[in-house]
Amino acid sequence: MPTWQEVVTSEDRVRLRDWRTAFTRALEQSRAANHSAEIESEGALLEPDAAIGGPIPNGDYRCRVIKVGAKSQGLLEYVTYPAFRCRIEQGQAQRFTKLSGSQRQVGLIYPADQLRQVFLGTLVLGDETQAYKYGTDGDRDVAGWVERIGDNRWRMVLPSPRYESLLDVIELVPEQ
């Protein structure tokens, strides 16, 4: 199986490289729009340097999406969605699938370093049943870091997503 460095698009390589800038800029914008209390209540989930290392195991997860910062005027600077169902399963590589919702990320999780893994995937919209292959439609490509941030708690940090927000964070908690 190829490494993530062999698969990633040049645009997503920049997103991954500049993740921290996107994270802090999104937080600044949301705080300026009076969302400090909501941000603080999330604890490690919305702290840029909260990664503590440890790969995410396969299984079913509750996935809660938080969109931080607005790409353009008129959009909300902070939105939290209720938990959706997600699954991580092993094939030739670890595969992440958001199983429900109107915007569903689907893709592969690659080893990266001691603190995190890389997610490269695509966005499935609405009632679509098939995902585009990563790298074929830049408007659908998604890239991010998967990080453990606590006991049985991970996050997927998606810097500079194509639509709506400056940063998407998906909280991943194993289903009991």
Regions from the language model: what does each represent?
Residues M1-I56:
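Amphipathic/hydrophobic helical signal segments and adjacent flexible N-terminal regions
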Residues G53-V118:
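Mid-length scaffold segments of soluble, non-membrane domains
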Residues L99-V106, T122-D127, L158-S165:
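Short, solvent-exposed aromatic-acidic interface loops
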